[in-house]
């Protein structure tokens, strides 16, 4: 039996710090466990059973971890939903996941409005609507759990997180893994072993800082793993470069999960600001989610030294890992296969590519990480390959392995835009624009943005009865704002007489996209 696991640590060392909220209010392990247990009892009393889904739309907050830890010890699936989504987008995930309970926040007016629109659109049962702030039609979390005991539940079994990841069809798909029977501490500390890939050890006064939204798969994975490893977690409401340096210095932060956009913003700080704060406590400042320009990473290594780590993985699984020293030998690599993983580069004819030859990147599907796309067996099967009696999966990325086994990415999922570490799928945006009567055809793609990596651009072919004008441009922008999350909104829209398609209707999107990338060091 493992000695790790948040619930064990909370029972044996209840006075240790678990969470530092964005307000810098401190929660001990014992306090966090007490609220977690109350929510567990309340959800079960409400009728949520093992295998059922609890969905959340929450900002970075202690309630995020209370919700996660309650699901994780009860056999529930937690479905974290991006709080930037519009009402119809939230409604789709609530309905598709079959959520029995919905925990939301109204601290931000737009978030409250989107959540209320979502539950109204699908007639979600009001008794299953719980909020962390005052919201019409929702029961406040404090009231929902007020009559419940803080004692550990008698029956405990490990739950799972089911993240939704968009596909080329534009509709999000739930990445669903089977529940693993067993003590939650044992099961969850097994998954927390991912931290060992970055030489992070249990306890040892480690402190993890969260500067990205917790609805991102990896951010919740790494920060919850930190709790199961006996670490403290410092929360930021949103990323602010100087604030992160302040918190690293104050709390002697040792680890974080970051994206290249955050590196860029840190490096943009004046030298006198950077010099004010001591970052020598950092040991594993891990980055992923988007390509990192070589010059940006080199600058971060010069500043933070060997604490800079990188990995390659997906919501579906992974992956590779590389430390600063190895990366410096092979700049641009995303690393070697981590323990237990295997990477293969497969040609279009199904054969294995030779070193330094590009192909589709496939990763071995481990027993503990087997998944299916909820409700889409066709997609599940389509993106798998049996090779040497092992099952591999792909997310469509193109790359190659060098002779030493280091992976280099050349391109990624067809047409996907990565902006500030967030995956944005053009098909969903295109489908939205096609609902407008003026739009005959549309292409959405990413163009360079120095800060965010990429930004969204739309090129629209108008119907015959419409002419391009500033008024129509404003109308289309307003239409997008009403139907899409802010991060998916085009920064610019161009009108075109005819989009480049072949006789079969295939869009030559690269003819539109490539001119913007001609002078860029990377088109990933």
Which functions belong to the PLM regions below?
Residues 14-15, 129, 134-136, 143-166, ...:
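Conserved pre-ATP/AMP-binding loop-to-beta segment of ANL
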Residues 41, 85, 91-92, 102, ...:
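AMP-binding/adenylate-forming catalytic core of the ANL superfamily
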Residues 183-207, 211, 215-255, 269:
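Conserved AMP-binding/adenylation subdomain of ANL enzymes
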Residues 28-30, 160-189:
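Conserved AMP-binding A3 loop
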């Amino acid at each position: 039996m493992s000695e790790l696991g948040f619930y064990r640590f909370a029972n044996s060392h209840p006075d240790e710090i678990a969470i530092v909220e964005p307000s810098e209010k401190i929660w001990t392990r014992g306090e966090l466990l007490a609220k977690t247990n109350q929510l567990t009892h309340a959800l079960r009393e409400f009728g949520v059973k093992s295998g059922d889904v609890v969905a959340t739309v929450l900002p970075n907050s202690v309630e995020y971890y209370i919700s996660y830890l309650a699901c994780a010890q009860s056999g529930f699936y937690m479905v974290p939903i991006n709080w930037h989504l519009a009402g119809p987008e939230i409604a789709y995930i609530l309905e598709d996941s079959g959520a029995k309970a919905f925990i939301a926040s109204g601290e931000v007016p737009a978030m409250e409005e989107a959540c209320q629109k979502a539950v109204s659109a699908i007639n979600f049962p009001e008794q299953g609507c719980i909020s962390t702030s005052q919201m019409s039609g929702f029961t406040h979390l404090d009231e929902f759990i007020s009559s419940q005991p803080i004692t550990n539940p008698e029956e405990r079994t490990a739950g799972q997180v089911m993240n939704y990841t968009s596909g080329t069809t534009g509709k999000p798909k739930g990445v669903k893994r089977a529940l693993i029977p067993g003590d939650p501490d044992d099961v969850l500390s097994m998954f927390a072993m991912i931290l060992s890939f970055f030489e992070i050890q249990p306890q040892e006064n480690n402190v993890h800082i969260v500067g990205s939204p917790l609805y991102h798969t990896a951010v919740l994975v790494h920060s919850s793993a930190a709790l199961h490893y006996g670490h403290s977690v410092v929360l930021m409401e949103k990323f602010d470069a100087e604030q992160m340096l302040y918190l690293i210095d104050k709390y002697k932060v040792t680890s974080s999960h970051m994206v290249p956009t955050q590196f860029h913003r840190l490096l943009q700080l004046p030298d006198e600001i950077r010099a004010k704060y001591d970052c020598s406590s950092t040991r594993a400042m891990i980055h992923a989610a988007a390509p990192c320009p070589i010059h940006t990473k080199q600058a971060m290594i010069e500043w933070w030294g060997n604490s800079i780590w990188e990995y390659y993985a997906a919501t579906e699984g992974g992956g590779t890992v590389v430390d600063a020293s190895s990366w410096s030998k092979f700049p641009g690599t995303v690393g070697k296969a981590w323990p237990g993983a295997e990477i293969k580069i497969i040609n279009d004819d199904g054969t294995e590519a030779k070193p330094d030859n590009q192909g589709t990147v496939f990763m071995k599907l481990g027993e503990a990480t087997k998944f299916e796309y909820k409700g889409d067996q066709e997609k599940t099967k389509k993106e798998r390959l049996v090779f040497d009696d092992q099952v591999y999966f792909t997310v469509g990325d193109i790359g190659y392995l060098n002779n030493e086994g280091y992976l280099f990415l050349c391109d990624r999922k067809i047409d996907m835009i990565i902006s500030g570490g967030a995956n944005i799928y053009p098909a969903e945006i295109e489908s939205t624009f096609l609902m407008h009567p003026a739009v005959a055809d549309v292409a959405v793609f990413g163009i360079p943005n120095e800060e965010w990596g990429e930004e969204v651009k739309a090129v629209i072919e108008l119907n015959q009865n419409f002419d391009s004008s500033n008024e129509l441009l404003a109308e289309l922008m307003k239409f997008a704002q009403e139907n899409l999350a802010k991060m998916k909104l085009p920064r610019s829209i161009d009108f075109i007489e005819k989009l480049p398609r072949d006789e079969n209707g295939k869009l030559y999107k690269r003819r539109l996209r490539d001119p913007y990338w001609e002078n860029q060091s990377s088109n990933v």
